[in-house]
Amino acid sequence: MRLPSILVVAASTLFLHYGYTSASPGADAVLTGAVSLGFLQLVGADQSVIEQPRFLRDGKIAEGDNEERVNAQKEAAAKVLDQVFKTKSLSPLDKLEKTSNLAVIRHVAAMVDDKVDKIFAFADAVGMGRASMLKMLKGDKQFTDAERLKTVKRYVKFLIKKEQNNKA
């Protein structure tokens, strides 16, 4: 709550308190609450906005933990991944080889896993089995045999995981 709204509540409560018909213990409680909120607002007025997440986590912050930095890392990872899918090339990933920021690489890996799971879910929805997946990948010359097998193994793991989730 902001201080001006607290002051308005306190002033209106004081106004009601002095009326003959509306004076009640409830008005006293509202006045006490408004004044205490106003006092807390004034006491905490020197606290900066940056300290709010720290307050919510009880002051327990890991070294180097910064919310803005995490958001920037996620945005950088999303940008690289979008470039990969728009250009249909892995050349934007070359930027990641040069970076020493492990968090960005982890975010990219997590986003790639999510994207691949969505693609596998679509393939499963249209009834594609692992043999069909392998046949489709053999038709594409930009994959090596090792990449084809790795993709099919990952697809099989996805199908097994999906079956286990359906049984549970």
From Swiss-Prot:
Swiss-Prot/TrEMBL keywords: Secreted, Signal, Virulence
Induction comment from the UniProt entry of this chain: Expression is induced during host plant infection.
Keyword Secreted: yes
Main location: secreted
Placement of sequence motif RxLR-dEER: 54-69
First and last residue of the signal peptide: 1-23
Superkingdom classification of source: Eukaryota
GO cellular component annotations of the record: extracellular region; host cell
Annotated compartments: Secreted; Host cell
Free-text comment about domains: The RxLR-dEER motif acts to carry the protein into the host cell cytoplasm through binding to cell surface phosphatidylinositol-3-phosphate.
Function: Effector that is involved in host plant infection. Contributes to virulence during the early infection stage, by inhibiting plant defense responses induced by both PAMP-triggered immunity (PTI) and effector-triggered immunity (ETI).
Family stated for the protein in its record: Belongs to the RxLR effector family.
The protein's name in its UniProt record: RxLR effector protein CRE8
Organism: Phytophthora infestans (strain T30-4)
Highest classification ranks of the organism: Eukaryota, Sar, Stramenopiles, Oomycota, Peronosporales
